[in-house]
Structures are given as structure tokens and as C-alpha cells.
Amino acid sequence: PIDGIEWDDDMLHRDGSNDVTIGTITSQWGTAATRWNSLYKAVARATKVIQALDNGTADGINEEKTNQYKGEAYFMLGFAYGELATYYGDCVLNKGMTLEEAYEAVRTPKKEVMAYAYECLDKAIELLPDSHTGQQRPTKGVALGIKARFALYHEDWETAAQAAEQCMNSKVYKLHDNYGELFKADSSPELMFYFKGDLT
């Protein structure tokens, strides 16, 4: 999942040597450390939301909204662990350990982490609605698409094909009719999950 020039083998800094070009990247290097920390913050927050909703502390929230919020939290949990396994391989799998247990935690094999990511995404698929008015919140199709993407990254072809087929069969998403107009429109059936930016 290349998502920045610092992961590209064609990267060039004109101002001299750096950690990328001289091969001295460590676990404390900017992007590596930031991504690791951010993903574990997402895990902690999503877990807290799920625990709160399971404990019935969501007074005043109806069942439909409870399912939506829980589905979004499971989506975030599955997404975070999928990213962790993709970028780092074996990593700590926290299913609600105490702080004391966390100090003694060891890395879980990548295969087990991905199995848990799939499990969380499957729960999200069950709970999330088919669509929202905007693309800023995950839906069933988005969770299926993310599951398919992670499965592709990890060469899990059968899971990737099944998730992609389910997403396509939902008929919610399709390619934009006119590619040249895609970037002018506020929305498109091709866009699954995005945050709108301001070009000015």
C-alpha cells in the first residue's frame, strides 16, 4: 500500500542524504512511528466505543444508531489492524487487555492479526447501513471494499474475490460515466469513502 513518496524507490532529496537514501530508517523514524502510534490510538478509541455500547451506556441512542456507531467502531478496528499487519507484519493484538497486560504484550503473528481484522470487518458489514447521504461514513460496501483490499495485499485471493463480488453485487457503487467530469463533481457513485477537500 504505497501512499506517500517516502515509500517510493524513486524518491529523491536534492538537499543531501537522509534516512531513506542512506538506509537508516528505524522504528522511531517519522512516518513509521507516526503511523504505528496513530493506528493504536484508533484501536483504543474503537475498542472503548464498542465496550461503552455493549455496556448499555449509550442512553438516548436508538437501536439503529447504536448499530451504526458499533459498526463504525468495528470498521475502524478492522481497518487499523489491517493497516498494522500490512505495514508492520506481526504486531500486538489488543482485544481489551489491561494496562498491566499491555506492558507484557508480545507481537501476534500477522496471520492471526489479519484473521481478527477480517472478523471486525465482518461485524461492521453486518451492522453498517447500505448507504449514507455522504461518503464520509463507512457503509457495508466500504467495509467490503476495505476487506477486499487487505485480502489482495496479503495474497488471500479467495477472500478478496468474495468481498469484491459482494460489494459489486450491492449495485451501490459503479464507475463514473465521464472520467473527465469525475473531478468536477461534488460526489460520484465511484467514490466509496472520502473526505472532501477544499481546492482554494
Which residue ranges define each predicted feature?
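All-alpha RGS (Regulator of G-protein Signaling) helical domain and cognate RGS-like helical scaffolds
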Residues: 114, 141-142
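Alpha-helical junction/boundary sensor with strong preference for TPR arrays
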Residues: 53, 121, 128, 170-171
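Short acidic-aromatic linear motifs embedded in glycine-rich loops, typified by GG[WY][YF]DAGD(H)
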Residues: 1-74, 82, 86-87, 91-112, ...
